[in-house]
Amino acid sequence: MMNNLDDNFDAILITGPTASGKSALALRLAAEVGGVVINADSMQVYDTLRVVTARPSEEDMQAVPHHLYGHVVAGAAYSTGDWLRDVAVLLQDLQAQNRLPVIVGGTGLYFKALTGGLSDMPAIPEAVRVMLRQRERVEGAESLHRDLTLRDPTVAARLDPRDGQRIIRALEVLEVTGQSISVFQTRSGPMIIDPQRARKLVVLPDRKLLHDRINRRFAMMMDEGAVEEVEALLAQNLSLDMPAMKAIGVSQIAAMLKGEISREDVIEKSSAATRQYAKRQMTWFRNQMNETWERVDPAANRSG
């Protein structure tokens, strides 16, 4: 079933929940077709968190070229638009080299933007971002939601009053443009990859096997440098609002370093959080990825 994947396709796209074996599948397919692997995971872009975010090993990255892994400093914001621009540059280079991109990751929005275009959002000055994050810390998300309700009731009605991230995003656009974020959400930029010219795979493993992998993986991470990575991250004194600080395992290991919980608690809590995240991903993929996305069982295809 996996033979001749490069025939008549401009790219191979692989998504699926965390710990599903999609990275191993991407590595194998890229090696088979002489392609390169491109990251589509919003946490694996950060430099400090190689182990915690389960980036490919150095051995794998040497076996096949890998791009957009660990290229963003932990203290920087990195949006879907930033990722899309980086991918567009890469794809131009790969086309000139006649090499097939194998794009893999669990961030569904990246794939939606890649194949369907991204809403044409305005640039937000850092000062506005900082101001609104500070307001959320002091006043709370529900206070910001009340503000949004007064200024943009239609959008506010769609948002959970506790969803600080989306509330802040809507307020950022209002602050900078004076217009509702909904105005910009209806404007889509060009697609980067024609979905009809891509082989699209969703890795959907057996639930029990996935949970077993998750439970084993975090214990291994603790032995392979996860604690040291989190220590290095905490030493940067970053705002808790930064995406890198929200990676699963960071808050749990930080609590252990403070003496609040044990190593065993870290493994249990982080594994539970990862299982919940994988469940949300599985639901999203089943609902958002239509029949043109081929469902793949990693065990049946020996993808690891």
Curated annotation (Swiss-Prot):
It catalyses: adenosine(37) in tRNA + dimethylallyl diphosphate = N(6)-dimethylallyladenosine(37) in tRNA + diphosphate. Its cofactor is Mg(2+). GO terms for biological process: tRNA modification. Substrate binds at residues 18-23. InterPro entries: Dimethylallyltransferase (IPR039657), IPT (IPR018022), P-loop_NTPase (IPR027417). Residues 41-44, 165-169 are annotated as: Interaction with substrate tRNA. The keyword tRNA processing applies. ATP binds at residues 16-23. SUPFAM superfamilies: P-loop containing nucleoside triphosphate hydrolases. The record marks 107, 129 as: Interaction with substrate tRNA. Coiled coil: none annotated. The keyword Transferase applies. Keywords: ATP-binding, Magnesium, Nucleotide-binding, Transferase, tRNA processing. Its EC number is 2.5.1.75. GO terms for molecular function: ATP binding; tRNA dimethylallyltransferase activity. Belongs to the IPP transferase family. Monomer. Catalyzes the transfer of a dimethylallyl group onto the adenine at position 37 in tRNAs that read codons beginning with uridine, leading to the formation of N6-(dimethylallyl)adenosine (i(6)A). This is tRNA dimethylallyltransferase.
